[in-house]
Amino acid sequence: MMCISKLPAVLLILSVALNHLRATPVRSGSNPQMDKRKCNTATCATQRLANFLVRSSNNLGPVLPPTNVGSNTYGKRNAAGDPNRESLDFLLV
């Protein structure tokens, strides 16, 4: 029982420690696409930890289902596809 009460404090300390980390640098000039994809390790880890804490804590309210924010979710545009000609019919009038 005592171990469970110390868990939030340990996770908070871990969050602060991860917040000060930096991602290992990629060689400059190697690949511009890789430079765009670089992730700040501290930011990613902190966000994952925050999501874990929100979903695992019963004291803070209801446990919310994970949000669907992927690239194939409703409302996203298909950037690779051609524009739909039927949707452009109103321009011809």
Curated annotation (Swiss-Prot):
Region (Disordered): 64-93
Places the protein is found: Secreted
Entry's Gene Ontology cellular component terms: cytosol; extracellular space; neuronal cell body
Leader sequence segment: 1-23
Molecular function via GO: hormone activity; identical protein binding; receptor ligand activity
GO BP: amylin receptor 1 signaling pathway; amylin receptor 2 signaling pathway; amylin receptor 3 signaling pathway; amylin receptor signaling pathway; bone resorption; eating behavior; negative regulation of bone resorption; negative regulation of osteoclast differentiation
Positions bearing Tyrosine amide: Y74
Gene3D superfamilies attached to this UniProt entry: 6.10.250.2190
Keywords per UniProt: Amidation, Amyloid, Cleavage on pair of basic residues, Disulfide bond, Hormone, Secreted, Signal
One Pfam entry name: Calc_CGRP_IAPP
Lineage top rank: taxon: Eukaryota
Biased composition (Basic and acidic residues): 83-93
Disulfide bonds: C39-C44
InterPro entries listed in its UniProt record: Calcitonin-like (IPR021117), Calcitonin/adrenomedullin (IPR021116), Calcitonin_CS (IPR018360), Calcitonin_peptide-like (IPR001693), IAPP (IPR000443)
Propeptide: 24-35, 78-93
Record function comment: Amylin/IAPP is a glucoregulatory peptide hormone that plays an important role in the regulation of energy homeostasis. Selectively inhibits insulin-stimulated glucose utilization and glycogen deposition in muscle, while not affecting adipocyte glucose metabolism. IAPP function is mediated by the CALCR-RAMPs (AMYRs) receptor complexes. Amylin can also bind CALCR receptor in the absence of RAMPs, although it is more selective for AMYRs.
Subunit comment: Can form homodimers. Interacts with IDE and INS. Interaction with INS inhibits homodimerization and fibril formation.
Comment field on protein domains: The mature protein is largely unstructured in the absence of a cognate ligand, but contrary to the human protein, it does not easily form fibrillar aggregates.
Family: Belongs to the calcitonin family.
Full protein name: Islet amyloid polypeptide
Taxonomic source organism: Mus musculus (Mouse)
